[in-house]
């Protein structure tokens, strides 16, 4: 019954067309984690733990535009609680040509967050702790997603007055008054869609700014 219901959900979500009549059925889907993807995740984005397991996660396929107007197919793993929300969001982003450069599994970067951020890769699930702490990240539960991270860095002023910037190569895009490609701004389409679907934006935090980051609190 569970697999049947999931198949119905995939059919319903993917049977939606754009306002121009383009069928999106081949580009957007939700699945339980396929065996080949699960194997790829082992020792990388997935580590043995008591918090989250395979049945809690979903594998998503989406389409997206880049800044040059080219269409790409992307994939990600997320918590099943936000799978439908992410499909709705990415369908609308695609309809309105909102640019996202890459959407690849973090496993392709050996779950190295710095590497994938430098490559401007958008991703969701990765079982890891918050940088510099022992606290589990919302990414560890598949409840957070980072969008175009190179151009939307994490920035925090430390006690000694220096700035911690992640990725380290993102200094040119820390000035949020400037306009540049792949930038997330308060009130733009990406920001609006995530907030409408119950996510919190890291760019609104007070003591630190995580402009790439949206997280969902169940």
Q: Positions of the model-derived regions?
A:
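Active-site acidic/histidine clusters and adjacent loop/turn architecture
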Residues: 52-117
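Extracellular/periplasmic catalytic domains that process cell-envelope and extracellular macromolecules
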Residues: 53-56, 136-142, 193
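Mid-length scaffold segments of soluble, non-membrane domains
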Residues: 100-101, 115-150
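N-terminal module-boundary/linker segments of secreted carbohydrate-active enzymes
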Residues: 22-70
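Bacterial Sec-dependent signal peptides at the C-terminal "C-region" and cleavage site
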Residues: 13-24
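Sec-dependent N-terminal signal peptides
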Residues: 4-15
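Catalytic cores and adjacent binding grooves of peptidoglycan-active enzymes
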Residues: 130-132, 142-218
């Amino acid at each position: 019954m569970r697999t049947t219901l999931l198949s119905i959900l995939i059919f319903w979500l993917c049977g939606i067309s754009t306002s121009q009549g383009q069928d999106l059925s081949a580009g957007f889907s939700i699945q339980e984690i396929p065996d080949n993807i699960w194997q790829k995740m082992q020792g990388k984005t997935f580590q043995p733990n008591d918090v989250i397991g395979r049945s809690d996660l979903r594998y998503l396929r989406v389409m997206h535009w880049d800044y040059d107007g080219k269409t790409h197919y992307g994939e990600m793993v997320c918590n099943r609680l936000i799978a439908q929300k992410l499909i709705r969001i990415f369908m609308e982003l695609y309809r309105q040509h909102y640019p996202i450069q890459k959407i690849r599994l973090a496993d392709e970067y050996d779950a190295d967050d710095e590497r994938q951020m430098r490559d401007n890769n958008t991703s969701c699930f990765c079982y890891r702790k918050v940088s510099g702490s022992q606290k589990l990240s919302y990414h560890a539960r598949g409840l957070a997603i980072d969008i175009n991270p190179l151009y939307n860095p994490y920035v925090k002023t430390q006690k000694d007055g220096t700035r911690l910037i992640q990725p380290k190569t993102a200094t040119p895009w820390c000035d949020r008054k400037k306009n540049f490609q792949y930038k997330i701004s308060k009130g733009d389409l990406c920001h609006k869609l995530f907030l409408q679907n119950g996510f919190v934006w890291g760019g609104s935090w007070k003591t630190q700014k995580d402009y790439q980051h949206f997280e969902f609190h169940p």
